[in-house]
Amino acid sequence: MDKKLENQKDLLNQDPKVELNSQSVAKNPLNSREVKPIQRRRPLRKNARDKNSKPEFEERVIAIHRVVKVVKGGRRFSFSAFAVVGNKKGRVGFGHGKANEVQDAVKKAIKDAQNRLVSVPIYRKSTVPHEIAVKYLASKILIKPAPRGKGIVASNTVRAVVELAGYTDIYTKTYGSRTKINVVRATLKALLKLRTINQVAELRDLSPQQAQAQKV
């Protein structure tokens, strides 16, 4: 009986923690060197936009019109939006969108403008290469080069187009109808007719220096 009591006391006095032998430690996969480290989270996708980064193209809403259509059941209202987009590096576009809501019409106009991008020449990274006058329907526009630092002399409608195209120094003057849509189309028509010195020299079989000395 005394031996049994002594054995029970020894069991009670033992440390409750279980001691691991060398074999159990070796078999434990967590203690082996072959266990791979925990993988980090996947990096962000390349096409994911950074919140702090600026978009390549900027957009401006030129006009929003409400359209009313009379049907048997009454009147149906919709909206028509016009927008200009550009990267300020010689790329600019003008688009039109229709929808039942203003926001949807603006989105469609911006998307349409992005699909209609055109390239325009920028002389010395600030102005147009030469003077030009263009007429579109009842609207007329005159565009002249300006010295560096002069800024943009233009109406709000024309300013939206030339700024997004990338011009920083330019003179403009509009005549006739001041309808915003016609003015924008006249401005784009004028910009598309601009020619660089190299283009003029190639057309006239002259050197760039000779073409620059002559009036374009």
Swiss-Prot record:
Pfam families given in the database record: Ribosomal_S5 (PF00333), Ribosomal_S5_C (PF03719)
UniProt keyword DNA-binding present: no
Cross-referenced InterPro entries: Ribosomal_Su5_D2-typ_SF, Ribosomal_uS5, Ribosomal_uS5_bac-type, Ribosomal_uS5_C, Ribosomal_uS5_N, Ribosomal_uS5_N_CS, Ribsml_uS5_D2-typ_fold_subgr
GO BP, sorted A to Z: translation
Domain S5 DRBM positions: 57-120
Key words of the record: Ribonucleoprotein, Ribosomal protein, RNA-binding, rRNA-binding
Keyword Ribonucleoprotein assigned: yes
Segments of skewed composition (Polar residues): 20-31
Gene Ontology cellular component terms for the protein in this record: small ribosomal subunit
Classification via SUPFAM superfamilies: dsRNA-binding domain-like, Ribosomal protein S5 domain 2-like
Domain description: The N-terminal domain interacts with the head of the 30S subunit; the C-terminal domain interacts with the body and contacts protein S4. The interaction surface between S4 and S5 is involved in control of translational fidelity.
Function: With S4 and S12 plays an important role in translational accuracy. Located at the back of the 30S subunit body where it stabilizes the conformation of the head with respect to the body.
HAMAP family on file: Ribosomal_uS5_B
Family: Belongs to the universal ribosomal protein uS5 family.
Assembly information from the UniProt record: Part of the 30S ribosomal subunit. Contacts proteins S4 and S8.
Protein name: Small ribosomal subunit protein uS5
Native source organism of the sequence: Mesomycoplasma hyopneumoniae (strain 7448)
Protein encoded by which gene: rpsE
